[in-house]
């Protein structure tokens, strides 16, 4: 699925040809939102045949409000606006029902200061190398339809020193992204949270910090990790779907609160869109996750928000390493994009512009109720099942 050519500064202003919602680009030949393009793909891939609820095939309204009410009429509308079935059939799908292969990311080398390697005590930096192995997450048991593939990238090997060896894909296998079905956004969000925690535990440098530091870093960074996950795994963020998921509407929610939630959802859409426009690869996402995770330990806090990390020196050093690694990787992988590193770093503050309470309200309220998300994070991280 490709984005339209030309200016992409406000791609979401182009309406979806199916339901009229803001589109996220061209999908199967027409401008469409994530919800309608995903519905069309699932329907064609699974060869679904729907029956109109009203018995009047094509007579049901298909707009932002009613698009999920009748699948038969929605599919008919997709075909009427010339969504291309062949484009779906010819897309390369997953090789298995779930992704079983992990993409291993290898990071080597130390940060060099004035030509010499900077050393830390065993208590300051538990591991001798930076991120000896960072495993890209497995999408276990995600009952989701594949939406796109990441083109196979040439293995990065044999790079001249002092440039370190950068991430490569195991066996050259491409990474497949999965669509998170709009009918189960809450479940998908819970899985994404689980995946983020599993990712953190897979980073040796992170897991060797004290448990207290690990939990505090997660509590501070879970929002950024979650939004990065939305951008990476293409979870639908159209307002009507998220409002339906949260159960909020004009009848049961006061206008000020509803308007605030809608505004936050729009901000989330903008942030996710900006990341997707840059078409980050798996390595860049991994580096950014490390940066935002360790940034929580070195950010300037004030007043009661001051966090007392036991190993602040190690956390600061690891964040520096993450930035240096990303910078070197981009210079090697994208030599014709000298501003790419700066653009990615400038996007990071936007991740914190989304209120954590909004994410909890929209994505997790039905799942965890009034249980604080920090408690869920702590329980999940301590679980031996992850």
UniProtKB/Swiss-Prot annotation:
Gene Ontology terms: biological process: cell differentiation; negative regulation of transcription by RNA polymerase II
GO cellular component: nucleus
InterPro entries hit by this protein: NHR-like_dom_sf, Nucl_hrmn_rcpt_lig-bd, Nuclear_hormone_rcpt_NR2, Nuclear_hrmn_rcpt, Znf_hrmn_rcpt, Znf_NHR/GATA
SUPFAM superfamilies in the cross-refs: Glucocorticoid receptor-like (DNA-binding domain) (SSF57716), Nuclear receptor ligand-binding domain (SSF48508)
Limits of the NR LBD domain: 155-384
Pfam families xref list: Hormone_recep, zf-C4
Gene3D superfamilies: Erythroid Transcription Factor GATA-1, subunit A (3.30.50.10), Retinoid X Receptor (1.10.565.10)
Keyword Transmembrane helix in annotation: no
DNA-binding region: 13-90
GO molecular function: nuclear receptor activity; RNA polymerase II cis-regulatory region sequence-specific DNA binding; zinc ion binding
Signal peptide: none
Major subcellular site: nucleus
PROSITE patterns tied to this protein: NR_LBD, NUCLEAR_REC_DBD_1, NUCLEAR_REC_DBD_2
Tissue expression summary: Prominent expression in the embryonal optic stalk and the distal tip of the forming vesicle. In tadpole-stage embryos predominantly found in the ciliary margin of the optic cup.
Compartments, as annotated in UniProt: Nucleus
ZnF (NR C4-type) residues: 16-36, 52-78
Keywords tagged on the record: Developmental protein, DNA-binding, Metal-binding, Nucleus, Receptor, Transcription, Transcription regulation, Zinc, Zinc-finger
Cysteine pairs bridged by disulfides in the record: none
Assembly and binders: Monomer.
Function, as annotated: Orphan receptor that binds DNA as a monomer to hormone response elements (HRE) containing an extended core motif half-site sequence 5'-AAGTCA-3' in which the 5' flanking nucleotides participate in determining receptor specificity. Involved in the regulation of early eye development.
Family statement drawn from the similarity comment of this UniProt entry: Belongs to the nuclear hormone receptor family. NR2 subfamily.
Record's protein name: Nuclear receptor subfamily 2 group E member 1
UniProt organism field: Xenopus laevis (African clawed frog)
């Amino acid at each position: 699925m490709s984005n339209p050519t030309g200016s992409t500064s406000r791609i979401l202003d182009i309406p979806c040809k199916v339901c009229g919602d803001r589109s996220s680009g061209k999908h199967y030949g027409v401008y469409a939102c994530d919800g309608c393009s995903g519905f069309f793909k699932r329907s064609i891939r699974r060869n679904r045949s729907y029956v109109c609820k009203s018995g009047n095939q094509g007579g049901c309204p298909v707009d932002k409000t009613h698009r999920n009410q009748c699948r038969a009429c929605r599919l008919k509308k997709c075909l009427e606006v010339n969504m291309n079935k062949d484009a779906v059939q010819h897309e390369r799908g997953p090789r298995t029902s779930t992704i079983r292969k992990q993409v291993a990311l290898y990071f080597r080398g130390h940060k060099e200061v004035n030509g010499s390697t900077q050393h830390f005590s065993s208590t300051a930096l538990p591991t001798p190398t930076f991120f000896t192995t960072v495993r890209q997450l497995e999408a276990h048991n995600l009952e989701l339809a594949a939406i796109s593939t990441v083109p196979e990238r040439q293995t990065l090997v044999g790079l001249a020193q002092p440039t370190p060896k950068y991430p490569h894909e195991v066996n050259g296998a491409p990474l497949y992204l999965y669509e998170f079905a709009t009918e189960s956004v809450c479940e998908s969000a819970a899985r994404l949270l689980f995946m983020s925690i599993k990712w953190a535990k897979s980073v040796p440098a992170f897991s060797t910090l004290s448990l207290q530091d690990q939990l505090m870093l997660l509590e501070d960074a879970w929002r950024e990790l979650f939004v990065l996950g939305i951008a990476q795994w293409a979870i639908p963020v159209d307002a009507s779907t998220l409002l339906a998921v949260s159960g909020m509407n004009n009848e049961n929610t006061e206008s000020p609160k509803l308007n605030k939630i809608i505004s936050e959802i729009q901000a989330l859409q903008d942030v996710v869109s900006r990341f997707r426009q840059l078409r980050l690869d798996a390595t860049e996402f991994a580096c950014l996750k490390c940066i935002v995770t360790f940034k929580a330990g070195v950010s300037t806090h004030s007043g009661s928000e001051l966090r007392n990390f036991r190993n602040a020196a190690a956390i600061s050093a690891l964040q520096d390493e993450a930035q240096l690694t990303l910078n070197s990787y981009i210079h090697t992988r994208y030599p014709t994009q000298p501003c790419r590193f700066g653009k990615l770093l400038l996007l990071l503050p936007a991740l914190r512009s989304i209120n954590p309470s909004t994410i909890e309200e929209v994505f997790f309220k039905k799942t965890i109720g009034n249980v604080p998300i920090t408690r869920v994070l702590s329980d999940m991280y301590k679980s031996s099942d992850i």
